[in-house]
Swiss-Prot record:
Gene3D superfamilies: 1.10.10.2830, 3.90.1530.30. It comes from Deinococcus radiodurans (strain ATCC 13939 / DSM 20539 / JCM 16871 / CCUG 27074 / LMG 4051 / NBRC 15346 / NCIMB 9279 / VKM B-1422 / R1). Pfam families: ParBc. NCBIfam families: parB_part. This is Probable chromosome 2-partitioning protein ParB. GO terms for biological process: chromosome segregation.
């Protein structure tokens, strides 16, 4: 059984409820040299868009860093908790110092603050959003990621209690409910890996949904169409036409007709029509089916 951590969870919820991500009005802002800061171990960002980083650097060069970085002291160094993108852009802009607010934060609190800032990005893709919110849920409930995922689905059916209130508080700050997240977005993590990678690269969720719900043998074809600019209606239309990517072989028919999943999904009239066709099918197809059996 997973051991819960109620005291640490209260500390985390206090951070979420009382420490704003917008630190521009803090009364203890100070300046630190950029070379005295290091990337935080709790940062959720995987990469930075160089073009957007350059644009931010130009803005900083003209107006300065308007939003202080949130940092903490770790082993005699200052570690960035929130604001790594501004720190990198400030270096590109040639700044020697950046404004910071220093807080004493645990690893768990620092991770939560970094996640919250990351989730407020304008260009956040849906996979980073789902990953970040699931990790925030795990921190809130004091569970590992996969355990939190299972627990979230259990809470949808459970009588409201302490955990419901904690999740309500966390998601309220993000303008969403955890129930909506659990019902509509959490399932995305079950989609095929190529679709997840495409979503992370910017593919719209509406297109990814069509690809993920298509038969496995059509997904690569549809994903390529989506990445080349096809609309949702065009993907749905393509799904209604036979695949043009490869010739249909007797072996392919045999594989489909030998699939229990395929056969169990047929209604009675379709199954009867298939039986009639099988009674007069070509010998080459019959041999292929026998080989698949």
């Amino acid at each position: 059984m997973t051991r819960r951590r109620p005291e640490r969870r209260r500390d985390l919820l206090g951070l979420l409820g009382e420490t704003p991500v917008d630190l521009s009005q803090a009364n203890d802002i100070r300046a630190l040299p950029v070379n005295e800061l290091k990337v935080g171990s709790t940062q959720p960002r995987r990469s930075f868009d160089l073009e957007r980083l350059s644009e931010l650097a130009e803005s900083i060069r003209a107006h300065g860093v308007l939003q202080p970085l949130l940092v903490r002291s770790v082993d005699g160094q200052y570690e960035i908790v929130a604001g790594e993108r501004r720190w990198r852009a400030a270096q590109l802009a040639g700044l020697a110092e950046v404004p910071v607010v220093v807080r004493q934060l645990s690893n768990e609190q620092a991770r939560a603050a970094a996640l919250i800032e990351n989730l407020q990005r304008d260009n956040l893709n849906v996979i980073d959003e789902v990953d970040g919110k699931l990790e925030l849920i795990a921190l809130t409930l004091g569970l590992e990621r996969e355990e939190a995922r299972k627990r979230l689905m259990q809470l949808l059916r459970a009588v409201p209690g302490d955990e419901h209130e904690q999740l309500d508080q966390v998601f309220r700050s993000m303008g969403e409910t955890w129930r909506t997240f659990a019902k509509n977005k959490l399932r995305i993590l079950n989609w095929p890996q190529p679709v997840l990678e495409a979503l992370r690269a910017g593919l719209p969720l509406t297109l990814g949904s069509v690809v993920a719900s298509a038969p496995p043998e059509r997904q690569a074809e549809l994903l390529k169409l989506a990445q080349n600019g096809a609309s949702r209606s065009q993907l749905l239309q393509a799904l209604q036409t036979p695949s043009q990517t490869s010739a249909v072989t007797p072996e392919h028919f045999a594989k489909v007709l030998s699939s229990k999943r395929f056969l169990s999904g047929l209604d009675t009239p379709t199954r009867e029509a298939l039986d009639r066709w099988l009674a007069r099918m070509p010998e080459r197809v019959r041999q292929a089916i026998d080989e698949q059996s």
